[in-house]
């Protein structure tokens, strides 16, 4: 690297910002330009469905860095600017205002966008009381409409849908949550964990309806507001506010148009490079081969974005990056903290540590004798211990995992001893 090297980062979310500041912290001396179409100061997204929506956080408290930190680190922040094309031959990105920025290294941190509800096109999608939750503007609009005794219909039983439902219940709204799946959190948790969260929400007052498909909407006479949600089973649900959260689509169009390999994300190698070695990708938009799980994955999480950003900074500055860590996720609903580590896909059994009747347990997902993932509810110590089990692939004794008379740290110590003697 030298003082004339140019790094352009496309995307001003967490991944992009962390790459920029990580480069400076690692000794990068060249130019850094951070480009994104958002017009607000880069900010954290997870609190939008939690503290911010509940009115317990301000926009300023969500900033990833203070506004003056960018100039202080000689990072040029180009907000409100869209990158429309990549010219790989000239090593330039083309901006919406016609400018071209030269790069020696290009980092795509383009993130993702909410998966659209197929039946919510036209006037429905433009209605002020029909929203997805991805941006600060979305959260502000929703927060203004969290009015006591009003009727909220949430479409989608994933993390966002459940977190929004919990916040709305606390605002004394009447909440109905619809999910096409047979249970909430079906894609990411085992049936007992889904049952725990369904019970938790129903006890709080949420009307959860699984196996329910939305087929349309009723609109006000002026076509400005949604007045009811229509379901395939004939149910009509009057609504003052509708929020849809049915997944994320990675923003790969820029990469695809530039001829980069795309497959449910921008495909990258172990060095974070795309099919063009001068272009890297990071965060929600990046698909990579996990060494831990020996399969291709795309992970939507804050910890993954942070880890990959640090890896890019280390690689570009000629340093040795850390080994892959187990991915982890979290969700706060009511006063319950759910923390999950690992990827449970492919598990063939679960072991419960604690009682599912109380908000104080861990669920281990196993494939054979290997622990693939762990869900912990209000057990932060076991969560941290579980990260070690999965990252280090420790051969813990499965029969002991459900026995609370044996501390998890002792199970881990025995597994380490077995590894060292092998």
Curated annotation (Swiss-Prot):
Among InterPro entries, the record links this protein to:
FAD-oxidoreductase/Apoptosis, FAD/NAD-bd_sf, FAD/NAD-binding_dom, FAD/NAD-linked_Rdtase_dimer_sf, Reductase_C
Query: What UniProt keywords are attached to this protein's entry?
Result: FAD, Flavoprotein, NAD, Oxidoreductase
What EC numbers are recorded for this enzyme? 1.18.1.5
Q: Where does FAD bind?
A: 15, 37, 50, 83, 134, 284, 302
Give the GO terms filed under biological process for this record.
(+)-camphor catabolic process
Q: What GO cellular-component annotations does this UniProt entry give?
A: cytoplasm
Catalysed reaction, written as an equation: 2 reduced [2Fe-2S]-[putidaredoxin] + NAD(+) + H(+) = 2 oxidized [2Fe-2S]-[putidaredoxin] + NADH
- Keyword check for Ubl conjugation, yes or no: no
Cofactor(s), names only, from the UniProt record: FAD
> Coiled-coil region(s) at which residues?
none
According to the UniProt entry, its GO molecular function terms are: flavin adenine dinucleotide binding; oxidoreductase activity, acting on NAD(P)H
Cite the annotated pathway: Terpene metabolism; (R)-camphor degradation
- Triggers of expression: Induced by camphor and repressed by CamR.
Q: Where does NAD(+) bind?
A: 156-165
Functional summary from the UniProt entry: The oxidation of camphor by cytochrome P450-CAM CamC requires the participation of the flavoprotein, putidaredoxin reductase CamA, and the iron-sulfur protein, putidaredoxin CamB, to mediate the transfer of electrons from NADH to P450 for oxygen activation.
> What is said about its interaction partners and assembly?
Homodimer or monomer.
Task: Provide the protein name.
Answer: Putidaredoxin reductase CamA
What organism does the record attribute this protein to?
Pseudomonas putida
| Gene label | camA
